[in-house]
Amino acid sequence: SMIGILGEDCSRIDIHFTEVRKMDNKEYEIKGASRTRLTLICLLKGNIYIDSISSCSQMMKSECMEVDGFIYGHYSFAEYGDKRYSGVFSGFFKQGYRVNGQQIEKGRNEMAELRLNLAEYRGNWRSANGLIKICSWADEVIPDTPVNFCLFNDAGE
């Protein structure tokens, strides 16, 4: 699961991918769910598209032994369910990866103290009635938070 923010008011959002299916070398189908305000849950389905792949420097590999590089691309995920609360997420992502034999796997950060994002999504959410909100989520540190935003929000969201 990843945690993030939605809208100018920085409402909490949680994103969880339940299924990933390779369509071809550049496209993957994603299924999962979003949760806002801790109670509103919408199932989602969409795609990620790979735009580029990079390798980590030797220095980065020594700090994060479970990361060989990053995959960069764009995404579009449509929520389905109650039309009042569903919409479409779209934007850009990065995902850390590692090579394990002949397999490419999701990267892992074994040193949580580094607070390094291995998965990061930035973009917009568009509601069924056309309302657009900025959104971002990640596996560690929420990207694009306002300067005065507290990462450990006690507001109950």
Summary of predicted features, one role per range:
Residues 1-157:
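Central antiparallel beta-sheet cores of small beta-barrel/beta-sandwich binding domains
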